[in-house]
């Protein structure tokens, strides 16, 4: 009887001010755009997150073996009109940690909605707008990808290194596209590279002929496309190729995946871009594990998704054994030095050390380390199309 009472008391203490849950129902949400503009990259992201959850459950060490992690998929559609429905799902399922969202707008809606209301930490593997960190007044938002101000700077430096002197730019008319375009443009202008024109692309606009005409008239050695392959990106490249105005494309992270290869292949040889990631032994180790579990590793944010789930699981473990009601502090603790390094496939090791009261430093697939704002420092992989395939050139 005494053990039963203590168990019940723990469950209330564990959740603190968040939400009540029943025994054996530690639930985290994988809130990503399974349909909509990110639907081609999200399945692998979700599978990677589920892989981390599976590792924790298989260990039988999570929360002293008393609980399992239950993960549920929430389709955000990457559409801000869906925010109310997403927040309702989070609340109804008593979710205590969120992996996501994939897109900035819906991430903002969750952060200012259910996350803020219930004190639920969220770790996004792909939302890059710096605005999210500024809106986070309760230290609930983290990301395992890097903010877009760095994306734009790094991509601009690669462009300059390739000797490109004149560039036409097109960008999605959203926070994601605007931030990327702003920082890309500023870095290149400071380096005396000419931006011939900068054209916003309205989401799902039926006819892009005017935008393509403006880009073609301005000209340049290359054209930058900062959107998503399913959301106007494919149509934009196709229209530009048909116009004959450009042969070289500078691509944002959400344009780099198998869909782009399959659709255009050798037609965009020598085009290039970046994705968040590294070529260290950590990511290579993760890729081996992912491939054994039939996860496609060719797209962006795969390692970041695995790491987001792993960090939440490990933070929950530390919270349990330290009787700490602030999960955000545990997220910072397990992800940053000092502590025993934890690499891909070693979640069970991390859980075991935390059970013993030891400090860990989760490195994971992408060398996770959060700054005071919850942003990852991160690195990038330069990708270039050669023989119709995206090839990694170097780490930046």
What are these regions (language model features)?
Residues 6-10, 19-396:
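Extracytosolic ligand-binding ectodomains
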């Amino acid at each position: 009887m005494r053990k039963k009472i203590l168990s019940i008391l723990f469950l209330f203490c564990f959740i603190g001010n968040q939400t009540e849950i029943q025994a054996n129902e530690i639930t985290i949400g994988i809130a990503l755009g399974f349909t909509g503009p990110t639907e081609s990259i999200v399945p692998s992201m979700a599978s990677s997150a589920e892989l981390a959850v599976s590792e924790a459950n298989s260990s039988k060490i999570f929360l002293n073996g008393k609980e399992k992690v239950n993960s549920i998929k929430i389709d955000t559609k990457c559409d801000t009109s869906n925010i109310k429905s997403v927040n309702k799902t989070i609340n109804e399922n008593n979710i205590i940690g969120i992996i996501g969202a994939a897109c900035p707008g819906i991430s903002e809606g969750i952060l200012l909605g259910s996350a803020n209301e219930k004190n639920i930490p969220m770790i996004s593997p792909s939302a890059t707008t710096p605005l999210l960190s500024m809106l986070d007044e309760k230290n609930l938002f983290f990301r395992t990808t890097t903010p877009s101000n760095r994306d734009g700077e790094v991509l601009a430096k690669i462009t300059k290194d390739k000797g490109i002197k004149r560039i036409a730019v097109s960008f999605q008319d959203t926070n994601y596209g605007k931030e990327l375009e702003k920082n890309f443009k500023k870095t290149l202008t400071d380096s005396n590279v000419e931006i011939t024109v900068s054209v916003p692309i309205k989401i799902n606009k039926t006819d892009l002929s005017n935008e393509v005409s403006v880009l073609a008239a301005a000209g340049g050695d290359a054209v930058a496309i900062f959107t998503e392959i399913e959301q106007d990106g494919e149509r934009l490249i196709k229209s530009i190729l048909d116009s004959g105005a450009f042969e070289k494309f500078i691509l944002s992270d959400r344009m780099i995946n198998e869909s782009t290869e399959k659709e255009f292949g050798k037609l965009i040889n020598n085009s290039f871009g970046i994705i968040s990631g590294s070529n260290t032994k950590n990511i290579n180790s993760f890729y081996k594990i992912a491939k054994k579990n039939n996860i496609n590793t060719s797209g962006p944010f795969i390692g970041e998704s695995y790491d987001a789930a792993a960090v939440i699981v490990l933070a929950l473990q530390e919270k349990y054994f330290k009787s700490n009601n602030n999960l955000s502090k545990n997220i910072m603790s397990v992800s940053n030095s000092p502590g025993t390094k934890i690499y891909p496939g070693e979640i069970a090791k991390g859980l075991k050390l935390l059970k013993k009261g030891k400090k860990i430093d989760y490195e994971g697939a992408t060398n996770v380390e959060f700054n005071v704002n919850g942003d990852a420092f991160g690195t990038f992989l330069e990708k270039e199309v050669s023989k119709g395939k995206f090839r990694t050139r170097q780490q930046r």
